Regions:
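Structural signature of nuclease core domains in nucleic-acid processing machines
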Residues: 1-322
Length: 322
């Protein structure tokens, strides 16, 4: 299902790009029609979903159309809340050929090149600077966790940001390129819970908050305000909360300074290099991790043939970083 949503989002973005509208001004009726067309085309590309020959297939198709319409609505509201402009969609690493951030020189004169795809890249530009926001669409409820980054389990978004920044430095050599944020958007249909009946407006606000992306945002006020210009207290668009004195609540926000983004990036580069060296050395040890809620075996497609018992003590505990 995740692939269908990804394809539909790419098609919707292209349709909007080729129209007379953009994310900031597209009328609701046009947005809904474009979204429906994009999803219908995406479904048609998957034979198992293309023909509604059963009631189950017909229901699933109808539900996917509804979730996708809601997804495009929420993404549009998130864009309109700020000044970041969606610029690029489904950018493959092949399009970033020659970027040093994607190539690692290993021992024995071996070069390792990374493969991947950036779902969406937004920019906020002024006379001297360009800030970048990287969005990764997820059909599962992925949360950004610095502990997982430290353990080498969640390196993807940091790599995407590094590659995007290098690309823009080459395109705009006279401007400062800054990390704005790395965010996961969960494609979902959340159930709203409330002790009292909600008005239509309250339900809409609650839905936006439930669909708020998760990730890491630059703590610079000019940057996070460019993602959500008018919020007070908790933002409905980014994982940031402001205290009454106007300062960021670090306990309730996921933020990092530009300098801290750079430190995280250097650490991720080190981890990737270490992984590359281990792969080249032939290290294929069965050494999965374990956290409080899952192990690396939980969603592994090879679990049926691996033979690893999740109860074995070999599983490394995923604990707080020192």
């Amino acid at each position: 299902m995740g692939n269908i949503y990804h394809t539909a989002l790419e098609r919707y973005s292209r349709k909007l790009e080729q129209s007379e509208y953009d994310w900031f001004v597209v009328p609701d009726a046009v947005r809904r029609q474009m979204a429906e067309n994009a999803m219908q085309e995406a479904i048609a590309g998957y034979p198992g979903m293309a023909v509604c020959d059963t009631a189950e297939n017909a229901y699933q198709r109808k539900r996917m159309l509804a979730i996708f319409d809601q997804t495009v609505w929420a993404l549009t509201r998130q864009v309109r809340a700020g000044q970041f402009v969606p610029e690029k969609f489904e950018v493959t690493f092949d399009e970033l050929e020659g970027k040093e951030s994607l190539e690692y020189r290993l021992s024995h004169d071996v070069t390792m090149r990374l493969e991947g795809r950036i779902d969406r890249l937004d920019t906020f530009e002024d006379e001297n600077k360009i800030s970048i926001k990287v969005i990764d669409y997820k059909s599962g409820n992925t949360k950004f966790d610095l502990i997982r980054v430290y353990r080498g389990l969640q390196l993807q978004l940091v790599v995407y940001m590094d590659a995007a920044m290098e690309m823009l430095r080459g395109q705009h050599p006279k401007k400062e390129i800054l990390p704005g944020g790395i965010l996961y958007y969960h494609i979902d249909d959340p159930v709203l819970e409330s002790d009292t009946p909600l008005s239509d407006e309250e339900a809409e606000q609650a839905l936006l908050f439930a669909l708020r992306p998760d990730g890491l945002v630059n703590s610079g006020e000019e940057i996070y305000r460019a993602m959500d210009q008018n919020f007070e207290g908790k933002s409905q668009m980014i994982p940031v909360e402001i205290k009454k004195n106007g300062e960021i609540s670090t306990a309730r926000s996921k933020v990092a300074s530009t300098e801290e983004f750079a430190v995280i990036t250097r650490y991720v580069e080190h981890e990737i290099r270490q992984c590359g060296e281990a792969i080249y050395a032939g290290n294929i040890a069965v050494n999965p991790y374990r956290s409080d809620i899952e192990t690396s075996c939980t969603y592994c497609p090879y679990a049926s043939v691996c033979g690893m018992d999740a109860k074995m003590p070999v599983l490394d505990a995923l604990t707080s970083a020192p």
